[in-house]
């Protein structure tokens, strides 16, 4: 099985450099263009399954890159973005030392209060991939988020700490 993992395209909140965890925001024009470019680069690959987190930005990106209707995208909440709690919608550059260092080294530092732990993120992403491994797919597309991609790659690369 070949697994294709990508992050969703740009949203207005991404453009404003705001932490966007569980806030449900659609793609902006740039994000739509990014997804179309990715589809072009992939070429004529057919995906046996197209998965996305339940957030609009991931579903839209998955439908475009996967070349399927939105209704055909398999939604799975285990690949939703990290819950940033009180840091949601804060500027990337104004997070403060605790969140900045945690996000740089989440496997070494405790999560700030209200922020989802790395253990939780790893547990749900590994559950998703272990279930996926049982499927008989040739090509699978997974469209999710920057945070969860770290734990998906950690599992696929067999990292001891479970995160990349």
Residue ranges of model-derived segments:
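Short secondary-structure boundary segments
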Residues: 54, 77, 146
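Acidic, low-complexity terminal tails and accessory targeting/binding regions
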Residues: 41, 75, 81-94, 138, ...
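Phosphate-handling substructures
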Residues: 67-126
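Active-site-proximal alpha-helix that buttresses catalytic centers in soluble enzyme cores
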Residues: 6, 10-71
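Short, active-site-adjacent cap segments at secondary-structure transitions
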Residues: 12, 57-59, 81-82, 148-150
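Short beta-strand scaffold positions
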Residues: 52-53, 123, 143-144
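Active-site-adjacent alpha-helix immediately C-terminal to a catalytic or transition-state-stabilizing loop
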Residues: 59, 126-164
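Extreme N-terminal starter segment of soluble prokaryotic enzymes
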Residues: 1-4
């Amino acid at each position: 099985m070949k697994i294709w993992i990508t992050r969703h395209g740009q949203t207005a909140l991404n453009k404003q450099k705001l932490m966007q965890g569980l806030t449900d925001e659609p793609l902006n024009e740039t994000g739509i263009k990014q997804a179309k470019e990715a589809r072009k680069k992939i070429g004529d690959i057919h995906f046996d399954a197209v998965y996305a987190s339940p957030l609009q930005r991931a579903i839209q990106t998955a439908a475009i890159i996967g070349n399927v209707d939105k209704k055909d995208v398999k939604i799975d909440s285990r690949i939703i973005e990290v819950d940033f709690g009180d840091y949601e919608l804060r500027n990337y550059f104004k997070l403060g030392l605790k969140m900045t260092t945690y996000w740089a080294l989440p496997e070494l530092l405790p999560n700030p209060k209200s922020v989802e732990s790395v253990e939780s993120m790893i547990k749900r992403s590994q559950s998703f991939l272990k279930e996926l491994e049982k499927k008989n797919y040739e090509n699978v597309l997974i469209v999710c988020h920057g945070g969860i991609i770290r734990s998906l790659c950690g599992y696929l690369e067999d990292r001891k700490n479970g995160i990349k």
